[in-house]
Design a protein with these regions (language model features):
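Extracellular/oxidizing-compartment recognition motifs
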Residues: 2-249, 303, 334, 339
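Composition- and surface-driven signal marking solvent-exposed, interaction-prone regions
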Residues: 108-109, 173, 283-285, 401, ...
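Active-site neighborhood of glycoside hydrolase catalytic domains
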Residues: 375-424
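Aromatic-rich carbohydrate-recognition surfaces in CAZymes
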Residues: 129-169, 197-205, 212-214, 218-221, ...
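Polar low-complexity intrinsically disordered regions
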Residues: 1-6, 403-407
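A generic structural signal for short coil/turn motifs at secondary-structure boundaries
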Residues: 118, 146, 372-373, 404
C-alpha cells in the first residue's frame, strides 16, 4: 500500500555526517526518501477507507485493504464512496457474493478529488462529454472486471451505488494499476531520487515523479477523441504511439492521454531525472514525426485527438526531439536523429518561411495552451524559435556533420533574439 500523505508529518534529516553517509552511499530504491514516494508497492491496489455512505450499506469496512468481506448494498439509495488514499488507475474488479439478487444493476463513478465525488465521474473526455458512470449488471454471485475501454486513467475516489431496488453483496474491490508497464511489478524502484531537509519540497518532487508514472500509459490505451465520441461515457482504448511499442509518456493520465509536444517538452527533464525512461520519451517523439504533414507541419495534438494549427507547438516538437537526444546520448540516439533529419529540415523550412520583413516569425497557426489564440509577432513563439534553431544547429553539426546548415541556423537564431529585444 502506498503511504497516505494527507496530513502526515515526516521526520526531518539531520544535516550532519549521517546525512552525508546517506547521500554518498545512496541507493535510489532504499532510504528515507522512499517515505515520500507515492507509488504503490503492488500493481493490485485496494480501497483503504470509507469516504462516505448513503442509504442501506452494511459491513462496508469488511472489504477494505484487500480483505475479502461481505458488504451489502440494498435499495436504490444505497451508495458508498471508497478512498484509495492516493491517485491510482486501471481496471476495477468487483467480486459479488451469494447474497446478491439476480437482475440487479450497480454503477461506478470515479474522481481524483473529493470535490467531484458523486454519482458521475469527473471529466476525462474534455468539455463536450460527460463521463457519467460505468454500469455493471449483477446476476447473483460472480466477478466483474470493467472493459478495457473503460479503464480509468486516474482516480483516488470510487463511488459504487445501486441502480435497482434489490440487494448486492460485495466481497472484494480492487484495481489493477497498469501505468508504466516497463517497470514490472515494483513501481517504487525509481532510478533517481531526491532528499533534503524541506518536507514540502521532498513531497513535491515525488508527486511530480509519480504524476509522470501515471501519465506513462500502455500504448493502446489512448483516449478516444471527444469529437467522435458519444456525449456520455469515456473510452481509453486507441493507440497513442506506434504499433509494437510498450508505452508512451503523455500529457496526463486521466484527461488527454495524448502526446502534445509542448507538454512533453517540459515533462521530459523530470522523466529522465526521476525515472530515466528513455523509451517512453522517444516513443512520443516518434509519434509526433509520424504525423507530420507533407507541408512539414507537426501536430498540435497527436492522435487520437489529432489536431493541427499551432505555430508554438510545431516548434516545441524540436525541443522535444533535442531533449530526447540529449538525455539519451550515444550512437543510438544519433542514428535516431539521422532517421528523422529530412523531416527536421522540412519542418524547419515551414517555420522559417513565416519570418517576415521584421525578422521575426509571424504567427499564422494561433493555437496554444490554455490561453487566447496567439497572433502577430508573439514573443513566446520567437523564444521557442530561437531555442529550436540553436539546438537544431547543434544537431546539424554534431550529428549530421553539416557545418553550413549549422552556421545558417545559428546565425538566424542570433538574429531572432536580437530583433526580439527590440519589440515595442
Amino acid at each position: 500500500m502506498a503511504p497516505n500523505h494527507a496530513g502526515k508529518r515526516f521526520s526531518k534529516p539531520h544535516l550532519n555526517d549521517e546525512l552525508s553517509n546517506l547521500v554518498f552511499n545512496a541507493n535510489p530504491a532504499s532510504g528515507p526518501w522512499q517515505e515520500y514516494n507515492f507509488a504503490p508497492e503492488s500493481r493490485t491496489q485496494f480501497p483503504q477507507e470509507i469516504f462516505a455512505t448513503e442509504g442501506n450499506v452494511q459491513k462496508a469496512s469488511s472489504v477494505l485493504g484487500g480483505r475479502r468481506g461481505d458488504m451489502t448494498l440494498s435499495g436504490k439509495d444505497a451508495l458508498i464512496t471508497f478512498d484509495f488514499y492516493v491517485n491510482t488507475c486501471g481496471m476495477i474488479t468487483l467480486e459479488f457474493g451469494e447474497l446478491s439478487a439476480s437482475g440487479q444493476q450497480v454503477s461506478i463513478a470515479f474522481s481524483e478529488s473529493k470535490a467531484f465525488v458523486g454519482r458521475g465521474s469527473d471529466r476525462s473526455m474534455d468539455f463536450h462529454v460527460e463521463d457519467g458512470a460505468l454500469s455493471v449488471g449483477v446476476d447473483g454471485q460472480g466477478t466483474r472486471t470493467c472493459p478495457d475501454a473503460q479503464q480509468r486513467g486516474a482516480f483516488r475516489y470510487m463511488t459504487l451505488y445501486m441502480e435497482t431496488s434489490g440487494t448486492v453483496e460485495v466481497c472484494s474491490v480492487k484495481t489493477y494499476n497498469n501505468m508504466m508497464p516497463s517497470m514490472g511489478d515494483d513501481l517504487r524502484q525509481y532510478p533517481g531520487f531526491f532528499f533534503g531537509d524541506d518536507e514540502f519540497l521532498n513531497t513535491i518532487w515525488y508527486a511530480g515523479a509519480y504524476t509522470l508514472q501515471l501519465a506513462t500509459i500502455p500504448t493502446g490505451t489512448g483516449r478516444r477523441s471527444d469529437w467522435v465520441h458519444k456525449k456520455v461515457g469515456w473510452a481509453n482504448d486507441v493507440p497513442a504511439a506506434l504499433d509494437g511499442t510498450l508505452e508512451v509518456l503523455t500529457d496526463g493520465a486521466r484527461r488527454d492521454r495524448t502526446v502534445w509536444s509542448g507538454d512533453r517538452a517540459l515533462s521530459t527533464l523530470t522523466n529522465y531525472i526521476a525515472l530515466n525512461n528513455k523509451i517512453s520519451t522517444k516513443n512520443g517523439v516518434d509519434w509526433m514525426f509520424k504525423y507530420q504533414t507533407d507541408e512539414g507541419v507537426f501536430p498540435y495534438a497527436c492522435p487520437p485527438i489529432w489536431h493541427y494549427g499551432s505555430d508554438s507547438y510545431h516548434l516545441w516538437t524540436y525541443v522535444s526531439l533535442y531533449n530526447a537526444y540529449f538525455f539519451d546520448g550515444g550512437d543510438d540516439a544519433k542514428d535516431w536523429v539521422r532517421q528523422k533529419w529530412p523531416a527536421v529540415k522540412r519542418g524547419m523550412d515551414y517555420a522559417l518561411q513565416k519570418i517576415d520583413d521584421t525578422g521575426l516569425l509571424k504567427v499564422t497557426m494561433p493555437l496554444d495552451w490554455g490561453r487566447h489564440p496567439l497572433k502577430g509577432h508573439n514573443l513566446e513563439v520567437q523564444g521557442i524559435l530561437y531555442f529550436s534553431l540553436q539546438k537544431c544547429a547543434e544537431l546539424a553539426a554534431d550529428v549530421m556533420g553539416d557545418e553550413i546548415l549549422a552556421k545558417k541556423w545559428s546565425t538566424l537564431a542570433t538574429s531572432v533574439k536580437n530583433v526580439s529585444w527590440e519589440l515595442p
